């Protein structure tokens, strides 16, 4: 049986971490949204061989157990005692190591696909609970809708969807290691976005007002090591973005625009400035 799933990228409308847990991992307080930039994940189950194989069109991704999609298949195969082999083919569109959750979304897509292929009958809530051991972004990616995400990433509260907004995403030509950034956090120096106010504004349908509450507490940490991210954000702001900020731990920066003409202006201006630029919409 073959199942194909769309795996959308995510952006962080708000990203905050007020403290670390005793296990050393951050406590998250985030608002996340899927965007229409997506990988496509095709999963095939077969009796022979009984192994898990991953193939991608990207030379930057491992094809073994380090790949989050592989880990997702392994979890379901082991938990539900499935003897079938699994072949996973990932058509990458989302930039790798970009702060856009591409690997996490691929893993979530594998969970949804195998749930269908093996007829496990699991709800999205059950898949999300199983997924936390893979990565903190995977539970959100199981749902891929506007959500308030807290805890280790396992508490996902759906929020009303934004109306039609345009998003320009730009990834500078550099890589950022999330574990390195997280180790560099000085909690006494973090500037915290108004995440709770953002959540309330979204719940009340005050989407334009919500822009003032968006922010990313880790911007300063990443920008200290990579000042070109700050320059990219400033360029988006000067070009008229309603909001411009870094997604995740970077290096991607996104501009949120209510008008398509403004988004096109930013997109066209950045194409000669940045190697990877995308104009998409919020999902």
Swiss-Prot record:
Keywords of this entry: ATP-binding, Isoprene biosynthesis, Kinase, Nucleotide-binding, Transferase
Superkingdom per UniProt: Bacteria
Designated name of the protein: 4-diphosphocytidyl-2-C-methyl-D-erythritol kinase
Family: Belongs to the GHMP kinase family. IspE subfamily.
Pathway(s) the chain acts in: Isoprenoid biosynthesis; isopentenyl diphosphate biosynthesis via DXP pathway; isopentenyl diphosphate from 1-deoxy-D-xylulose 5-phosphate: step 3/6
Catalytic activity: 4-CDP-2-C-methyl-D-erythritol + ATP = 4-CDP-2-C-methyl-D-erythritol 2-phosphate + ADP + H(+)
Record: residues binding ATP: 95-105
InterPro entries on file: GHMP_kinase_C_dom (IPR013750), GHMP_kinase_C_sf (IPR036554), GHMP_kinase_N_dom (IPR006204), IspE (IPR004424), Ribosomal_Su5_D2-typ_SF (IPR020568), Ribsml_uS5_D2-typ_fold_subgr (IPR014721)
Key word Kinase present: yes
E.C. number: 2.7.1.148
């Amino acid at each position: 049986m073959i199942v194909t799933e769309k795996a959308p990228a995510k952006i962080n409308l708000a990203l905050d971490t007020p403290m670390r847990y005793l296990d050393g991992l951050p406590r998250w307080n985030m608002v996340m949204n899927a965007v229409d930039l997506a990988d496509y994940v095709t999963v095939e189950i077969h009796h022979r061989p009984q192994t898990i194989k991953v193939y991608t069109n990207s030379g930057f991704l491992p094809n073994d157990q380090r790949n989050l999609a592989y880990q997702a298949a392994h979890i379901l195969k082991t938990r539900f005692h499935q003897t079938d082999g699994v072949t996973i083919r990932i058509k990458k569109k989302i930039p790798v190591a970009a702060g856009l959750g591409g690997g996490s979304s691929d893993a979530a897509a594998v969970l949804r696909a195998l749930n269908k292929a093996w007829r496990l009958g699991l709800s999205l809530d059950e898949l999300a609970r199983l997924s936390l051991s893979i990565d903190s972004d995977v539970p959100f990616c199981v749902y891929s809708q506007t959500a308030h995400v807290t805890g280790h990433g396992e508490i996902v509260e759906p929020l009303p969807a934004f109306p039609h907004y345009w998003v320009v995403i730009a990834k500078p030509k550099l890589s950022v290691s999330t574990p390195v950034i997280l180790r560099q956090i000085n909690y006494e120096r973090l500037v915290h976005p108004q995440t709770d106010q953002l959540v309330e504004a979204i719940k009340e349908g005050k989407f334009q007002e919500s822009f003032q509450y968006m922010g990313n507490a880790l911007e300063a940490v990443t920008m200290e090591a990579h000042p070109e991210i700050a320059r990219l954000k400033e360029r988006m702001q000067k070009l008229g973005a309603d909001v411009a900020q870094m997604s995740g731990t970077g290096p991607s920066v996104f501009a949120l625009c209510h008008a398509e003409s403004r988004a096109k202006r930013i997109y066209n201006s950045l194409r000669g400035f940045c190697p990877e630029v995308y104009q998409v919409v919020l999902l």
